[in-house]
Amino acid sequence: MSEDYEMMCGIEIHQQLDTKKLFCSCDSHLCDDGQGAYFRRLRPTTSEMGEVDRAALAQFQRHSGYRYQCCKGTTCLVELDEEPPHDVNPDAMQIALTFSEMLGANIIDEIHFMRKIVVDGSNTSGFQRTALIATDGSVDVGDRKISILSVCLEEDAARKVETTKNDEVLYRLDRLGIP
């Protein structure tokens, strides 16, 4: 049985934007030390389809706990998941739209932020907010046209600082929410 296959490879590229955070007006620089911390244990919930995510359930059953450090000027109640997200950062949205135009991509008519489940504790809410901005773009590299399937705008995760012997993970919230 001989079949002819062609190699195809994809790459996902992330670029932090030099703006305020995506859903609040906090600065987006990283700090060297955290001031204060709080503990959280994330629990799995039933989806709108009536099912519990198996990965979230397995992480919960490990009895893992998460401790989060705050940083002055880079953390507010939005990162702590104690306040709803504010309106999307217009500078970050404009950068994503401009980049999409530069790629000749098809910008989505109505942009909505989706919630992707995150079970490792790197987001205090248990999910990451991501928006599909555009599809079907391309970039010319020499004599080749490289397809760009999608452009998304999303918030970055918290930084893992350490893991204790008890499987408790310490995250710093300065990076959480950077577009």
Question: Which residues make up each language-model segment?
Answer:
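Basic, nucleic-acid-interacting segments
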Residues: 1-179
